[in-house]
């Protein structure tokens, strides 16, 4: 991999790996090698959840568990992680197999999000919990400063349903129109039909649930509720 690209990535991350092989593994999709990033992703997912939960607990001492859970879900969901990945220009650093390269895997939200979690796992193994916690807080500073408890943190499907019920409109319908990829790495495409919108809105995700949430979020934007 191009060392100039890797050095630029590490500057954007705010962390230089002592063991470069951990960085290489974190950037490797299972389509490219048997030594891929899924175990690091598993580790990073748990670390990220803990760090964000801890930050919210101390930032909002009077907020109940339900609101904190919703805020955490907003901060650690796939599209937020994919936004971070794009801020790091992570797509140009991914190691993908020929099939994923051809199908534009370097732009796919699920792959970008999973790689951010793998990087978190890699940083932890390369350093310690204090270092990776501070790094995550640096990445999330603006988002943590801007987030607040309340209905906005309900997931998109819930907010869309409540809006439609409040206006005495039928509930949305979700239809799977495409499933791409192998069983271990699928991408679902959902059409969501909503009263008041002339055409179905489209959402994609690594599971049916995530794709439905993405479609609901697009519907909310079209209804100008975001």
From Swiss-Prot:
Keywords tagged on the record: Cytoplasm, Endonuclease, Hydrolase, Magnesium, Metal-binding, mRNA processing, Nuclease, RNA-binding, rRNA processing, rRNA-binding, tRNA processing
Organism domain of life: Bacteria
PROSITE patterns: DS_RBD, RNASE_3_1, RNASE_3_2
Residues annotated for Mg(2+) binding in this entry: 41, 114, 117
Subcellular localization, as worded in the UniProt entry: Cytoplasm
EC assignment: 3.1.26.3
GO molecular function: double-stranded RNA binding; metal ion binding; ribonuclease III activity; rRNA binding
Enzyme superclass (EC): hydrolase
GO cellular component: cytoplasm
Domain RNase III: 6-128
Cross-referenced SMART domains: DSRM, RIBOc
Every DRBM domain range: 155-225
Pfam families named among the record's database cross-references: dsrm, Ribonucleas_3_3
Known cofactor(s): Mg(2+)
Catalysis performed (reactions): Endonucleolytic cleavage to 5'-phosphomonoester
Residues annotated as the enzyme's active site: 45, 117
HAMAP family, per database record: RNase_III
Entry function: Digests double-stranded RNA. Involved in the processing of primary rRNA transcript to yield the immediate precursors to the large and small rRNAs (23S and 16S). Processes some mRNAs, and tRNAs when they are encoded in the rRNA operon. Processes pre-crRNA and tracrRNA of type II CRISPR loci if present in the organism.
Family: Belongs to the ribonuclease III family.
Name of the protein described by the UniProt record: Ribonuclease 3
Organism the protein comes from: Salmonella typhi
Lineage: Bacteria, Pseudomonadati, Pseudomonadota, Gammaproteobacteria, Enterobacterales
């Amino acid at each position: 991999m191009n060392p100039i690209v890797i050095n630029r990535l590490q500057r954007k991350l705010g962390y230089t790996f002592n063991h470069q092989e951990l960085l290489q593994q974190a950037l490797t999709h299972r389509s490219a090698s048997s030594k891929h990033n899924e175990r690091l992703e598993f580790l990073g997912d748990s670390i990220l959840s803990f760090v964000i939960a801890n930050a919210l607990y101390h930032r909002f001492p009077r907020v109940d568990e339900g609101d904190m859970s919703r805020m955490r879900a907003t901060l650690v969901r796939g599209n937020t992680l994919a936004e971070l990945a794009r801020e790091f220009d992570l797509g140009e650093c991914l190691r993908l197999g020929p099939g994923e390269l051809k199908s534009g895997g370097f732009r796919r939200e699920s792959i970008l999000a999973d790689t951010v979690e793998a990087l978190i796992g890699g940083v932890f193994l390369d350093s310690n919990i204090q270092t990776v916690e501070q790094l995550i807080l640096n990445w999330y500073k603006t988002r943590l400063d801007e987030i607040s408890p309340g209905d906005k943190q309900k997931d998109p499907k819930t907010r869309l349903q409540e809006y439609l019920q409040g206006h005495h409109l039928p509930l949305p319908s979700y239809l799977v129109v495409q499933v791409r990829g192998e069983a271990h790495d699928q991408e679902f495409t959902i059409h969501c039909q909503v009263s008041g919108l002339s055409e179905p809105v489209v959402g994609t995700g690594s599971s049916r649930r995530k794709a439905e949430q993405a479609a609901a979020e697009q519907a909310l934007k079209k209804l100008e509720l975001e």
